[in-house]
């Protein structure tokens, strides 16, 4: 997904530094630009942040229109702070264009709003792993969304139980949110481990609590969409 403003800025680009989770179709907006892969791929190949900063500065000093293309929204787990600091250290001005973060793309694909009238007035976004490499799950909001959780689903189920979530709490897992092949499966805290197989090797977000509940109004649109979903086993 890309916003209209993002697409317009991309069309002007001379150089594009892009992340791993970028749809290749976006190249159509800037076919004449130089595209530089600076992606991080979980446990695979990753471009170090210092190297990304250096490439960004080099491109900005040589070209008038440079785009740093990120998946989702740059201000949500996008390392935006480091890159802004690098640019500001050299007196280089830039514009930050908002994007569609995975939590929102997942909510749209699953048709399960993150906030619900009367039951869901707070949302927490967090990574499944801390910066120390420890799996952590909390219960600080009505809806908890965990990013980059695909490899930790069985362990996350246990951590959610330890954090006080009842075993029957609704859980929604969406992998490759915002892509044409996005996949939604529905579970409970107790059965979350079942999501490991269908979402294997796919970037996933896990929504727990109010934002994972099914809508009570089964509209025709929702009914058609849910035909492609896996219902939870409690």
Per-region residue spans from a language model:
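A contiguous loop/helix-start segment that scaffolds small-molecule binding in enzyme catalytic cores
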Residues: 51, 61-66, 79, 122, ...
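Class I SAM-dependent methyltransferase SAM-binding "motif I" and its flanking Rossmann-like core
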Residues: 73-141, 183-186, 234
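Class I S-adenosyl-L-methionine
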Residues: 4-97, 190-199, 233
């Amino acid at each position: 997904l890309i916003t209209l403003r993002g697409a317009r800025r991309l069309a002007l680009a001379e150089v594009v530094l892009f992340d791993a989770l970028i749809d290749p179709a976006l190249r159509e907006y800037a076919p004449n630009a130089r595209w530089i892969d600076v992606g991080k791929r979980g446990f695979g190949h990753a471009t170090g942040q210092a190297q990304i900063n250096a490439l960004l500065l080099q491109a900005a000093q040589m070209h008038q229109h440079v785009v740093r293309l990120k998946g989702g929204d740059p201000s949500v787990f996008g390392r935006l702070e480091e890159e802004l600091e690098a640019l500001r250290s050299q007196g280089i001005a830039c514009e930050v264009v908002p994007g569609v973060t995975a939590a929102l793309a997942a909510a749209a694909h699953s048709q399960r709003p993150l906030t619900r009238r009367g039951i869901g007035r707070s949302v927490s976004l967090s990574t499944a792993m801390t910066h120390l490499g420890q799996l952590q799950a909390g219960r600080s909001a009505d809806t908890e969304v965990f990013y980059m959780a695909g490899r930790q689903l069985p362990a996350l189920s246990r951590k959610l139980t330890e954090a006080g979530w009842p075993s029957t709490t609704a859980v929604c897992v969406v992998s490759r949110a915002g892509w044409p092949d996005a996949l939604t499966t529905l579970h409970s805290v107790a059965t979350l481990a079942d999501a490991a197989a269908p979402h294997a090797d796919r970037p996933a977000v896990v929504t727990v609590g109010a934002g994972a509940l099914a809508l009570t109004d089964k509209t025709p649109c929702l009914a058609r969409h849910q035909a492609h979903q896996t219902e939870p086993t409690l």
